[in-house]
Amino acid sequence: MNIQKITFGNGCFWCTEAIFQTLRGVQSVTSGYMGGRTANPTYMEVCNGDTGHAEVIHLEYDADELSFDELLLVFFKTHNPTTLNRQGNDIGTQYRSAIFYYTEEQKQKAEAMIKRLTDEKVFDSPIVTEVTPASEFYKAEDYHQNYYNDNPDKSYCAFVIQPKLNKFAKEFTDKIRPELLR
C-alpha cells in the first residue's frame, strides 16, 4: 500500500464525505475544518463565518489503487468549482472550493488539472478553486462523521446528498468500491 493524504473543500462536508466514502482505494474520510484563523473551531463558529475555515474532508487513500489525478477528477466533477463561496443553497466562505495540498507534486497536479479543465472548457465560468498548502486540520464534531450513512432518512440526505451520489455513480461506476455496486 502507498497511503497518501489530501484535504478537499467542496461544499457541505456531508455530501463530499458520502461521495468519497464510496471510492475504491479510499482508506478513510474524516469531516472537519481547515484554512481558518482560530484553533479548534466549532461547527457553529464556522457556520457563522467567525473563523475563516472551510468545511473539508480529509482523505487517506492508497495511491497504488487510486491516483491523485483520479481523485481530482472526482473532486471537480462532484461540485461546482466556478461559484465563489457557494455550493447550491449553501452560501458562505465555509463552502468554498479548495484543495489543501501536502506536497509540491499535489500542488502541481492540482494546478495542471485546473488548466486542463479550463482549456477544455469543461465549465462555462472560470474555476475559482483555491490551491493552498494544508494547514491544521480540525476534526468536526462526531455527529458530522459518516452523516449520510447514519442519517439516510433525513430530508437533506434524501433531497441533496442522494441525487449527488446518483450522478456520481453514473459517471464514475468504475471507481466505486465493488461491494457497493448492486
Predicted feature residues:
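Flexible coil/turn and secondary-structure edge motifs
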Residues: 1-182
